[in-house]
Amino acid sequence: MRILIVDDSAFMRKLLSDLFTGEKDFVVVDTARNGKEAVEKTKLLQPDLVTLDVEMPIMDGLEALRLIMQETPTPVMMVSSLTKAGADATMRALDLGAVDFIAKTNGPISSIQDIRQEILAKAREAVRVNVRRLTRPQTAPITQRSVLPFGGGVQGTDKIIAIGTSTGGPRALQEIITRLPKNLPCGVLIVQHMPPGFTRSLAERLNSLSDVQVKEAEPNEPIRPGWVYIAPGDHHMRVERNGGQKILRLTQDPLIGGHRPAVDPMFDSVAQTYGKQTVAVLLTGMGHDGAQGMKKIKENHGFTIAEDQSTSVVFGMPKSAIELGVVDRVVPLQAVAAEIIKAVSL
């Protein structure tokens, strides 16, 4: 796999190049110092993957990404700083077609080395992505958004919608959450594999585009109808009963399958607290997080939905649940919101 590394810092170019050195399946074909060089070298070299810094002189990473996706569609993995501005820019990059991102550490070299395997895994997954699927997500115009009718047995927060996703998730979530109506009679819980800070930017972006209220979850917060709660980076999110309420519990328990937040503990907890009132969804993502949790939801007679292969950026997490035989409906991304609304209305 041929990689082009783009960063205005010579130190970061060498650090990232060294990460891939010694891996038999990677070859760093060249490096670039700014977005202009990145666009030119992507055209010339036709790499399998581009790692692209966000903040650069002459042309920044976002403009370079836009041109690359327009002129030479190629899998791109952003390299972002751990700042609010960096997280916001990363959300825009994922919207423009970046496959994934690496959170650039401000610490010692060892900090990058600590996540070496994660970077390599992301890179191996990114090169297999069909970038034609990374067209801009469709945000439903207000006039076309669903209006969920009350009735059909829907009662307050008796039901819960639980969604798990990873690679490609922010774009998939935008497709779904913007189609949920303001009068949604239950809460929505989301686990998106993402570091601290980035989940807040994701929540803010979705909130600005949606009729429902979207926020990063807070400790011991009660679940309210019409609200969407995104698990904060580096925290597992579970549901617990607290008297007559159901509240969100955030913990820093050990990583599960290399993830925190992970989908499985969230799914496990809703299976226990909501049982058959659960509507669970697995979207695009690498690995198998969420499959076992979805199995528990199914065992408790909840309703389960998985995104199909045709629209998944990475068909890993949904595939794992489908292979376990615990999915009621397998549908393309564009049909997921309608399936959710139908299930909540039953």
Outline where the language-model segments fall.
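Conserved acid/base catalytic micro-environments in cytosolic active-site loops
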Residues: R2, A10-T21, D25, T31, ...
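Conserved acidic carboxylate
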Residues: D7
